[in-house]
Amino acid sequence: MGLRGNVRSLDVSAYEAKACGGTVTKGSRVDDMQSCCSYRFDERGYVTGTEYLCGGHVVKWEEFVYDGSGRPERIVSRSVRYGGDRTVEFEWNGRCHVRRPFDEEGNEVSEERTEWRRNRSESVAVGGDGSVTFRTRYKRGLPVRQERTAADGTEVLKYSYDGNGNPVRVERFVNGAAAGFAEMTYTVFDGAGNWTFRTVYRMAEGGERVPYRIEERKITYY
């Protein structure tokens, strides 16, 4: 998340962005639990819990458990849509790990194996829909290129950042052809240097850059 300082909590809210007379204004709140969520951290900086909101209500919770060296060991997920807990378990072997999600009945859904080599990682996930391979390249600890390969083709995301490590542009390619982009501008920061207000732009059907979302973050510290 690229957060600075000893963060205790992070609350993210997203709104529709509206262009009006050369300016961008905030519209209705987005009812999307991937865009409106809350994170809680311990004093080591590890995420201990998340909450996802839709329509102003919490619809999904996650709790994170780490081993003695700070590596994720288990994630427990609860949702108003499940009949019980879903879990993810991790098995570590040096710079490799296996990630296994289970459904609410305890059945293993898929298996994902990830290996890191210097500034690269490769993950292979195998499940009921076949296999998917993810390859990521990093620069200064930040992902700059992510490639997803599956039976339906290849998708590539390319990331650009500002001097503070905030993403400013994401380009998307599908089977080698350009398929859109997103650009982010940051206008408000808190005392620790973390952004609290940004505008997200996307490519319209005609290829022009148009405002898409306004995102706000509320951050508390230890």
Range-by-range predicted roles:
Residues 1-222:
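Buried hydrophobic residues that stabilize the cores of well-folded domains
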